[in-house]
C-alpha cells in the first residue's frame, strides 16, 4: 500500500517494501515516526550543518523527511541491519524525487562515523540488537550528541529504559501521543560496556553418512535468532533434513546463523550451498560458522543479502531448505512465507524439493498444495511440522 505521509506540512508517499508483496494493507510508517519527526522540527534540532544518524528506519519514513530537494539538507546517515528496510528507504526516496546527495546507508556491522550531532533511534524488537547498538553508539559519539528514541508506548517498558540508562546515561520519556512515546538520553562519561556479541556456543553433530561425529562451534551476532543455543525448531528441522547427493545445489533460505546449511555440508561436503538472508548480521554469522567449522568447503558456499530469492536464476537449484519468518519488524504477516514459497517454485529445477519447517498453526500445507500441486508431511510433533513439496 502506498501511504500518504503528511507530517510537518510535507506531503510524501511511502510504500512498504518489497512493493510486490501480497499483503499490501500494512503502511510503511507509524505514529512513532510522526512523533519523532514533529519533535525534531518543533525543537529546530536539524539544519544544513547537522550530521544526523538514523537507526532502524523500517522503510525510510525518517530518511525521506530529511532528504528534501533543497540546499538546506543535513547530512543523513541511515544504519540498518535489514536489507529490505535499506532497499525500502532507497525506493521511497527515489519515488518521492528527493535529493539523496547527502544521504548514506550503512549496515549494522559498519563502523559508525564520528562527529554525529543528532541520533534518531527507532527501538528494535530485539533486545540484543538494542544493547549492541547502544554500546557502539556510546563508543562513537561525544557527550553533546542529541539522542532521541521512539517506539509504540506499549513497547517501552521500565526494563527498556534501564537498558538506555545503563549504556548511555540519564534517560527520560515523553508523554504518549497517538500511542507512541519518545525516549531522551543524555550521554554520561562512564566507561563503555564491553559488548557480549557475537556469542559463541557448541552443538553436537552426528553425521548421517560415514563421516565422524563432531562438535560444531556456532557464532551469533546480536540480531540473529537463538543466540546462545540451538532453538527447538532448528533442532527438529535438522533431525528431518533430506539426504543430499554430491554436487547438489542447495539454498538455506532465511539462513540466520547458517546452522541448517552447515549441517548439510557436514553431512555432504561435496554439496554447493547458498546462504540467503535479509539480515547483515545473519549473513556474517553464517559465513563465520562455515569458516570456523568447515573452512575447506568455503569455495562451495555463497553468502547473499537478498529479499527472498530475488534475481536468483530460475530452474537452477536442487533443494531449498526454509524456516519462514512470520514477522516483518513488529507486524505479524504471512506474505514473507508466501513470497519464499513462490520464489522457491520458480528457482527449483524440475524434480527439485522445497523442504520447510513451521509452527503447526500456520498451515503452510495449504500454500504448498496451491503452488506445487503436492505436499508431503515429513514429520510433526506438538509444535512443529516439517513438510516437503516437489516441483513437477
Swiss-Prot record:
Family: Belongs to the methyltransferase superfamily. RlmG family.
UniProt name for this protein: Ribosomal RNA large subunit methyltransferase G
Gene of this entry: rlmG
Key words of the record: Cytoplasm, Methyltransferase, rRNA processing, S-adenosyl-L-methionine, Transferase
Any one Gene Ontology molecular-function term assigned to this protein's record: nucleic acid binding
CDD domains named in the record: AdoMet_MTases
Native species: Colwellia psychrerythraea (strain 34H / ATCC BAA-681)
Subcellular location field: Cytoplasm
Main location: cytoplasm
EC number: 2.1.1.174
Enzyme class, UniProt record, top EC level: transferase
InterPro entries: DNA_methylase_N6_adenine_CS (IPR002052), rRNA_m2G-MeTrfase_RlmG (IPR017237), RsmC/RlmG (IPR046977), SAM-dependent_MTases_sf (IPR029063), Small_mtfrase_dom (IPR007848)
Function: Specifically methylates the guanine in position 1835 (m2G1835) of 23S rRNA.
Catalytic activity: guanosine(1835) in 23S rRNA + S-adenosyl-L-methionine = N(2)-methylguanosine(1835) in 23S rRNA + S-adenosyl-L-homocysteine + H(+)
Amino acid at each position: 500500500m502506498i501511504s500518504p505521509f503528511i507530517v510537518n506540512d510535507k506531503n510524501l508517499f511511502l510504500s512498504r517494501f518489497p512493493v510486490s508483496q501480497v499483503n499490501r494493507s500494512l503502511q510503511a510508517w507509524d505514529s512513532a515516526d510522526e512523533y519523532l519527526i514533529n519533535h525534531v522540527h518543533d525543537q529546530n534540532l536539524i539544519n544544513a550543518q547537522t550530521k544526523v544518524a538514523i537507526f532502524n528506519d523500517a522503510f525510510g519514513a525518517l530518511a525521506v523527511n530529511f532528504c528534501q530537494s533543497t540546499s538546506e539538507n543535513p547530512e543523513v546517515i541511515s544504519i540498518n541491519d535489514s536489507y529490505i528496510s535499506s532497499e525500502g528507504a532507497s525506493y521511497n526516496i527515489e519515488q518521492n524525487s528527493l535529493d539523496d546527495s547527502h544521504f548514506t546507508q550503512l549496515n549494522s556491522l559498519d563502523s559508525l562515523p564520528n562527529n554525529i550531532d543528532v541520533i534518531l533511534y527507532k527501538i528494535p524488537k530485539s533486545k540484543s540488537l538494542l544493547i549492541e547498538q547502544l554500546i557502539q553508539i556510546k563508543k562513537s559519539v561525544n557527550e553533546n550528541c542529541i539522542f532521541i528514541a521512539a517506539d509504540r508506548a506499549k513497547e517501552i517498558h521500565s526494563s527498556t529504559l534501564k537498558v538506555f540508562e545503563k549504556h548511555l546515561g540519564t534517560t527520560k520519556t515523553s508523554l504518549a501521543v497517538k500511542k507512541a512515546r519518545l525516549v531522551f538520553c543524555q550521554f554520561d562519561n562512564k566507561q563503555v560496556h564491553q559488548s557480549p556479541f557475537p556469542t559463541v556456543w557448541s552443538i553436537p553433530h552426528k553425521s548421517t553418512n560415514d563421516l565422524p561425529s563432531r562438535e560444531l562451534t556456532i557464532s551469533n551476532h546480536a540480531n540473529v535468532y537463538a543466540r546462545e543455543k540451538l532453538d527447538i525448531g532448528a533442532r527438529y528441522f535438522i533431525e528431518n533434513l533430506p539426504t543430499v547427493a554430491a554436487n547438489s545445489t542447495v539454498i538455506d533460505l532465511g539462513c540466520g546463523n547458517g546452522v541448517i546449511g552447515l549441517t548439510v555440508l557436514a553431512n555432504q561436503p561435496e554439496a554447493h550451498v547458498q546462504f540467503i538472508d535479509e539480515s547483515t548480521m545473519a549473513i556474517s554469522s553464517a559465513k563465520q560458522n562455515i569458516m570456523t567449522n568447515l573452512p575447506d568447503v568455503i569455495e562451495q558456499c555463497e553468502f547473499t543479502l537478498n529479499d527472498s530469492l530475488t534475481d536468483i536464476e530460475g530452474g537452477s537449484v536442487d533443494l531449498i531448505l526454509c524456516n519462514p519468518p512470520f514477522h516483518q519488524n513488529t507486524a505479524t504477516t504471512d506474505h514473507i512465507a508466501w513470497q519464499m514459497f513462490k520464489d522457491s517454485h520458480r528457482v527449483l529445477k524440475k524434480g527439485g524439493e522445497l523442504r520447510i519447517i513451521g509452527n503447526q498453526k500456520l498451515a503452510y500445507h495449504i500454500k504448498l498444495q496451491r503452488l506445487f500441486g503436492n505436499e508431503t508431511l515429513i514429520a510433526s510433533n506438538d509444535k512443529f511440522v516439517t513438510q516437503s513439496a516437489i516441483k513437477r
